[in-house]
Structure formats: structure tokens, C-alpha cells
Curated annotation (Swiss-Prot):
Its biological purpose: Catalyzes the ATP-dependent transfer of a sulfur to tRNA to produce 4-thiouridine in position 8 of tRNAs, which functions as a near-UV photosensor. Also catalyzes the transfer of sulfur to the sulfur carrier protein ThiS, forming ThiS-thiocarboxylate. This is a step in the synthesis of thiazole, in the thiamine biosynthesis pathway. The sulfur is donated as persulfide by IscS.
Biological-process GO terms, alphabetical: thiamine biosynthetic process; thiamine diphosphate biosynthetic process; thiazole biosynthetic process; tRNA 4-thiouridine biosynthesis
Name of the protein described by the UniProt record: Probable tRNA sulfurtransferase
GO molecular function terms attached to this record: ATP binding; CCA tRNA nucleotidyltransferase activity; tRNA binding; tRNA-uracil-4 sulfurtransferase activity
């Protein structure tokens, strides 16, 4: 079947009132960015639907795949746009039926947005079903459990006919909900947390704490790859890599061993808080899950959060670990997340970290050293990378450069 349009159904933005135009415009911009590099199509965003007009050479499968990854889209259907005459509709219905297997069953489903159309729903079903039955002897109707369902939408401008409905990613268009800073560790949880807030229309930049030589270049490349996977959904993402060795060593030098994890997290939050103000973000996002590890109890969260007045969003707070793993596999980050390269949160983990840290104690331990200068130095020396969906890892870039230099 050669389709001439893609019908794109909106997600939650259909619930928006006077702001709907803003959401539709943002979604159209996101669609155009996602389809960059492809040709043979024209995007037409309307208030209630988006239509993508296809030329003969358009790669409909690739376009549909990319659309399915965009937040704000509920579903996509390859459609035939048909004139509002029974003759044109019957001819299109026969085209669909030509693709059916022998002895298969079908039904006609009609939705009339144009209530002034000359035929009602039942009449259309009868006429189109009758046209198919007259043309084929080995096809029958089954309205309860059909093998095929031809869907017909009667709209003001034309008739749209289709069979397939491809699920989209739902949510709201990225860019409509403000900017956040994602604390990206390299584990399973934080990429999922980033994906969850992006699904609510939020733009993200990511921050990662790197402690060489205790953490390897492979750990850094792992985080770059996780960012690249997230960028497949939303376009380029800035990744801020913080040189954290000096701060982490000092924490382990002056803070009681049971409190080093709490204090380390507080230092991370202080660095993140400064970066939030630099980039104009409105919140910090992390993958914390209540009670999962020692640093994620309510007592720990209270002690850690105390260093910032910036809102901290925890979209995975109440998830079961198995739920997070399932989502990680769905979004394509799981296999990268489980690569055995340690991050700075795991290399200095104490044997018996405190699970209910006393806030006054952690402040007392940190008071023996003025960390502010180190924190400012870490922020000043941040390495910022813009990660795109086709971003090559540092190792690949270096290898290519060496090859080019050699040649």
C-alpha cells in the first residue's frame, strides 16, 4: 500500500486550552528537528492533528520510527487522503482489501468529525463493506474479532483511511516545561529519571561527577553514551563533566567514614546548585529511589537537600527497582548502564554508611574545612560537551584523528 500522508495524533496537549497553540508549535519544531536529514515530506501542524504529506520517495518507515520517539505524540498512522465521495472511499477500501490474506475477516470503523457529511456512520460502514464484499469472494465481515480493521475518519477537509496505528511516546512536547539539570551517574536509575521528566515537556542538561584516576575514561564514555541515547529522543543535550577528585579526596580526609557518602552527596548538590543558576535551570533532577540505598532514606535526603534551595525532582522516588529496570530496557539505556565501570559514588563507598545521618553531625564534620574554594574551582573547570544522537565517543574521535594525522 502506498500511503500519501502520516496522521499524527497529539498526546496530552489536546487538554490544553488557550496555550494549545504554543504546545502545537513546539511539537512541530521538535518534529522538524527529529526528521532533519530526511526529505520527501511536508509537516502541517493543526490545532487538533498533525499531518505529514509524503512524496513518492519519502522513507515512511524511518519517518514513522522517528515520530514514535517524540514526546507529545500519542500515535501515528500511515493514511490515504481521499475525496469526500462514496466512489473515492469505496476505491480506497478495495485497495486496502487487496492486501488481505485469503479467507481473512475485516470490519469498517467510521468516525465522523464532520457531522454534516451526507452519510451517517452506519451507512458508510455498509457502503464500504459492501464494496469490498462485491469485489472479493474470499473475504468476510467479522465485527467482533476481525483480522483487519479499516478505519475511516470523516474530517472537514477530506476523508482519511488507514489500518495501522503505531504507538507514540505520549506526554508533552519537550521545550514546554522549562529547563532542569539531570544528575547523571551512569547507573540504571538516572537516565530513566531524565527520560521521565522529558516526557513531561521538560528540557534537560546533564551533570556528571568524574574523579580520575579513581574513575576511568570508560566510565566517562559510558555517561556520554547514555546522554547520546537520551538525545535520540530530544535532540542535542549539554553534558557538564565536573572534575570531582579534589573535593572527594578532601571529604574522605576530614569527614567521619560513616558520613562520607552523605557529605559527598552534599558537595555534589552544592556544585549542581551553582551550575543550575549559571544555565538558567529551574530544578535539579536525580534518580533517587526512596529507601533503595543508604543515601536515599528520608533522613539522608533531608541532610543532603539542606545545601540547596533549588527544587529537587525525583521522578522514580516510589518505583520498584524492577519497574525501573523495565523502563531502562524500554528506552534502550539498560545495557549501557550495567557496563562494569565504576563511578565516583561507588569507589569510595564506606563499609557501613549511616542510613539516618544526624544533620548537626554532618555539618560539624564539614566545618573543619572550608570547601567553598574547592567547589568554585570544580565549577570553573567543568568540561561541557554537546551530545547529539550521532555523537562519537572520545576514543572514536581520537582514533579517527590519529588515522587522519597518519594519512
Amino acid at each position: 500500500m502506498k500511503y500519501d500522508h502520516l496522521l499524527v495524533r497529539y498526546g496530552e496537549l489536546t487538554l490544553k486550552g488557550s496555550n494549545r497553540k504554543k504546545f502545537v508549535n513546539q511539537l512541530r519544531n521538535n518534529v522538524n528537528k527529529s526528521l532533519k536529514g530526511l526529505d520527501g515530506f511536508v509537516v502541517k501542524g493543526k490545532r487538533d492533528r498533525m499531518y505529514i504529506e509524503l512524496e513518492d520517495h519519502a522513507d515512511i518507515n524511518e519517518i514513522t520510527y522517528r515520530l514514535s520517539k517524540i514526546f507529545g505524540i500519542k500515535s501515528i498512522s500511515p493514511v490515504l487522503k481521499v475525496e469526500k465521495t462514496i466512489e473515492a472511499m469505496s476505491a480506497a477500501a478495495i485497495k486496502f482489501a487487496q492486501q488481505f490474506e485469503e479467507n481473512s475477516t475485516f470490519k469498517i470503523d467510521v468516525k465522523r468529525a464532520d457531522k454534516n457529511f451526507s452519510m451517517d456512520t452506519y451507512e458508510l460502514q455498509r457502503e464500504l463493506g459492501g464494496a469490498i464484499l462485491k469485489h472479493f469472494d474470499n473475504i468476510s465481515v467479522n465485527v467482533k474479532r476481525p483480522d483487519h480493521e479499516i478505519r475511516v475518519e470523516v474530517r472537514l477537509d477530506a476523508i482519511y483511511m488507514y489500518e495501522e496505528v503505531v504507538p507514540g511516546s505520549g506526554g508533552l512536547p519537550v521545550g514546554t516545561g522549562g529547563k532542569t539539570l539531570l544528575m547523571l551517574s551512569g547507573g540504571i536509575d538516572s537516565p530513566v529519571a531524565g527520560m521521565e521528566v522529558m516526557r513531561r515537556g521538560v528540557t534537560i542538561e546533564a551533570i556528571h561527577f568524574h574523579s580520575p584516576p579513581f574513575t576511568s575514561d570508560q566510565a566517562k564514555e559510558k555517561v556520554i553514551e547514555l546522554t547520546r541515547i537520551l538525545a535520540e529522543r530530544v535532540g542535542p543535550i549539554k553534558l557538564h563533566i565536573v572534575p570531582f577528585t579534589e573535593l572527594q579526596k578532601q571529604v574522605n580526609k576530614v569527614v567521619h567514614p560513616r558520613y562520607t557518602m552523605t557529605s559527598t552527596r552534599r558537595m555534589m548538590m552544592r556544585v549542581a546548585d551553582k551550575l543550575v543558576h549559571q544555565i538558567g535551570a529551574l530544578a535539579i533532577v536525580n534518580g533517587e529511589n526512596l529507601g533503595q540505598v543508604a543515601s536515599q532514606t528520608l533522613h539522608s535526603m533531608y541532610a543532603i537537600n539542606n545545601v540547596t534551595s533549588t527544587p529537587v525532582l525525583r521522578p522514580l522516588l516510589t518505583y520498584d527497582k524492577e519497574e525501573i529496570i523495565i523502563k531502562s530496557k524500554e528506552i534502550g539505556t539498560f545495557e549501557t548502564s550495567i557496563q562494569p565501570f565504576e563511578d565516583c559514588c561507588t569507589i569510595f563507598t564506606p563499609k557501613n554508611p549511616v542510613t539516618e545521618p544526624n544533620f548537626d553531625k554532618v555539618v560539624q564534620y564539614e566545618s573543619v574545612f572550608d570547601f567553598e574554594e574547592m567547589i568554585n574551582r570544580a565549577v570553573e573547570n567543568i568540561e561541557t560537551l554537546e551530545i547529539t544522537s550521532d555523537y562519537k565517543t572520545i576514543k572514536e574521535q581520537q582514533t579517527n584523528q590519529l588515522i587522519n594525522d597518519f594519512l
